Design a protein with these regions (language model features):
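Bacterial N-terminal signal peptides that target proteins for export
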Residues: 1-11
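Bacterial N-terminal signal peptides
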Residues: 10-19
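Extracytoplasmic c-type cytochrome modules immediately beyond a signal peptide or single-pass transmembrane anchor
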Residues: 21-152, 161-179
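Short, cysteine/histidine-rich loop/knuckle motifs that typically chelate Zn2+
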Residues: 155
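Short Cys/His-rich local motifs and their 1-3 flanking residues in nucleic-acid-associated proteins
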Residues: 158
Length: 179
């Protein structure tokens, strides 16, 4: 009984210390105005999850609903979804052309972060991020590549037929408040 109680107390003490270190990290970040490492990591993890969800949705929509060039393109569906997400205040998300031949002129890198991130993605990076201030709050800007993953992509983007396997032809640009 004593051993079990001792282990339980030790576990509670360790949990308390761990929580204390996390709270200290959060508290020190509040004093400096900079986000804590833990907050940045949580936001980074959210970007990765959103990236997986959005890309999986586009592939599934393309696979199940895009059969010829008269069907509504999955990329256009993604852009509509991104607009709704941003309009509702969840986060900023944009589809960006990396190929140099955008399907829509709006889908080009617009600011310094996006232009630099596109260069890095073209050079083979698989993720680019930067912590910035947006509307007086810390935010994580991130960009991930979109390679051609299906033959159906060339129905709307015939120039993708020449893309090297795995090369970025597009990207998703994210802006999330760090909380």
């Amino acid at each position: 009984m004593y051993r079990a109680t001792s282990l339980l107390v030790s576990g509670v003490v360790l949990a308390g210390l761990s929580a204390g270190f996390l709270l200290a990290d959060e508290a020190s970040s509040e004093k400096t105005g900079k986000p804590s490492k833990a907050a940045i990591e949580r936001t980074r993890k959210t970007v990765r999850m959103l990236d997986d969800v959005y890309k999986t949705a586009v592939v599934l929509i393309t696979d199940k609903y895009v059969h010829d060039e008269n069907d509504f393109p999955a990329g256009s569906a993604a852009i509509a979804l991104f607009g709704e997400v941003e309009k509702k205040g969840w986060h900023g998300v944009r589809l960006i052309d990396v190929s140099g031949q955008p399907y829509d002129p709006e889908n080009v890198a617009k600011d310094d972060f996006e232009k630099d991130a596109v260069r890095q993605l073209r050079d083979g990076k698989d993720y680019v991020e930067k912590v910035v201030e947006k509307d007086g709050k810390p935010a994580l800007r991130a960009m991930t590549p979109i390679p051609v993953v299906m033959q159906k992509c060339v129905m709307c983007h015939p120039h993708y037929a020449d893309a090297k396997k795995g090369a970025a032809v597009g990207a998703i640009s994210y802006t999330l408040t760090i909380e």
